[in-house]
Amino acid sequence: ANADRLGYRHDFTIYDASDSLSLIKSIIRELQLDDKTYKPSTVQAIISHAKNALIEPQAYARNRELIEMDTRSKRPLIHEIYRIYRQRCFVSGAMDFDDLLLQTNILLRDCPDVTARYQEQFKYILVDEYQDTNYAQYVIIRRLSQLHSKVCVVGDDAQSIYSFRGAKIENILSFKKDYPSAMVFKLEQNYRSTRTIVEAANSVIERNSKRMEKKCFSEGDMGEKIRVLRAYTDREEAEMVVSDLRDKVRAAGDEWAEAAILYRTNNQSQALEDALRRKGIPYRIYKGNSFYDHKEIKDLLAYICLLYTSPSPRDRG
């Protein structure tokens, strides 16, 4: 809606990350730039950061700090790639994901009637994971809430881990300043972790210079002492985890079904599976697929088996 106010068709196209990267690659080739210096994914990330900071191509080119930073990194033409990229997207009637935020801000900034309409439509605004919002999202929320100031946000400044994607911790830290009449409810009791873990987390986070004052606590068991294992590779880490698990299961006389390994990302499973297989430990993966059950891996293993088991011409003769 309202895309026509920005010069776009109402049925504009949305470029995903792959579409965006392809366009950036073609621009780098056209400008005859070295794609090792101007790595497309790096250029894409820089443009994304600029948009999330509401910096348009013209402003980027005039920003001495950004230009000096690009020059030091031997990429002085980032601003030109950004300008061409923005122009190509516009001519093609397309926006990428970051444009959806940037163009929304431009719309709310330049079209007061649109802003007034949406302020009435969205009198109450609820934002989850507020600590992960970027500057562009912050400004949208501020503009929409300017009339009624009825904003509820949920977040934890101690869990802000997406600054590399443009998240601004200042958004949640300045919430009371932005909305002076807002009430703050601190959820300080932890129902999941042992007291040892909560106290350790408190001792680390209290060293932050920029934080909201709170003291988390747990009424659960004290739990085991925290151990830190240092590993240099994912394979070494998996070996340490599996060896430790095996020793504990044997010492306690438990069944393997009573043991579990929790991991955060799916790509960690392969190293763990390999370590379990090497030690002959049976396992099942819950709510996910084994690395060796992926179709492409099964196909590849089948080809390898075929190569090893097929008789050679000499054997057939």
Task: Enumerate the predicted regions with their spans.
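Short alpha-helix plus adjacent loop in nuclease-associated cores
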Residues: 159-162, 287-307
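Conserved helicase NTPase motor core
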Residues: 69-174, 189-193
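Proline-centered turn/helix-capping motifs that create local helix->coil transitions or kinks
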Residues: 51-59, 94, 149, 204-214
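Short, polar/flexible loop-turn hinges at active-site or ligand-entry regions and domain interfaces
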Residues: 2-16, 28-38, 65-72, 89-93, ...
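Conserved P-loop NTPase-based nucleic-acid remodeling module centered on helicase motor cores
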Residues: 1-46, 55-59, 229, 243
